[in-house]
Amino acid sequence: MPELPEVEVSRMGISPHMVGQTIKAFVFRTPKLRWDIPQELKLLEGQVIRNIRRRAKYLLIDTDQGTAIVHLGMSGSLRVLDADFPAAKHDHVDLKLTNGKVLRYNDPRRFGAWLWCAPGESHAVLEHMGPEPLTDAFNSEYIADKAQGKRVAVKQFIMDNKVVVGVGNIYANESLFKSRILPTRQAGQVTPQEWVLLVENIKATLKIAINQGGTTLKDFAQADGKPGYFAQELLVYGKAGEPCPECGEPLQELKIGQRNTFFCNECQQ
């Protein structure tokens, strides 16, 4: 599943080709992805793309007449191509530009989304979200306060979008390992000093992943079609049974909140 770094890499990849360009037409090859594709997106035809933003794992394509909101779901990807490039299987949405280019959305599992939001309004999918992890609003004081009295596992806690957005499964596993915190520990039992380290590692891990082009495990590709290379940097994710890179003991695996969780019983407390 594309997580925050992969979505940010997609934003960085498509923005230079799209901001300032005019939308010529939308082409929908399916009426529905995760949800019905709103016909209001057609209102954006003829509009200039003013900006492309990211909020959590959503991309927001802004015009004066509203915003197209894109979620990559489990297997979605975006590429900027020549408009006459033939559509392939699973190419479900085209956003055609007047400069002869097209933003093409491919999604084999069709669990992503294209939504629309009127000017000056906020879509329901973007409400009740915590701060972005790479901003100053996400800091150890903030999250330590949020965690007081919480009995939920710390891994599940930092993956809660109401607490902080965009800390997906891969990056939660890696950050907890680097911080030597067991993912099963109750969030309320994490000390202030440990929160300082964990916040630092979450930020650092996400930044490295963005610089590496994200993590390609199966479906994700960058806007130019290239894979992300952060998978080569993974310390514990997907490595159950392999030696811990710190102590050599076999890495463990269990499920927390239905998500695969990888850790070292010796190094993490």
From Swiss-Prot:
> Where, by residue number, is the active site?
P2 (schiff-base intermediate with dna), E3 (proton donor), K57 (proton donor), R259 (proton donor)
Checking PROSITE patterns in the record gives:
FPG_CAT, ZF_FPG_1, ZF_FPG_2
| An example Gene Ontology biological process | base-excision repair
- The name under which this protein is listed is Formamidopyrimidine-DNA glycosylase
Report the EC code(s) recorded for this entry.
3.2.2.23, 4.2.99.18
Kindly state which keywords UniProt assigns to this record, in alphabetical order: DNA damage, DNA repair, DNA-binding, Glycosidase, Hydrolase, Lyase, Metal-binding, Multifunctional enzyme, Zinc, Zinc-finger
Function, in words: Involved in base excision repair of DNA damaged by oxidation or by mutagenic agents. Acts as a DNA glycosylase that recognizes and removes damaged bases. Has a preference for oxidized purines, such as 7,8-dihydro-8-oxoguanine (8-oxoG). Has AP (apurinic/apyrimidinic) lyase activity and introduces nicks in the DNA strand. Cleaves the DNA backbone by beta-delta elimination to generate a single-strand break at the site of the removed base with both 3'- and 5'-phosphates.
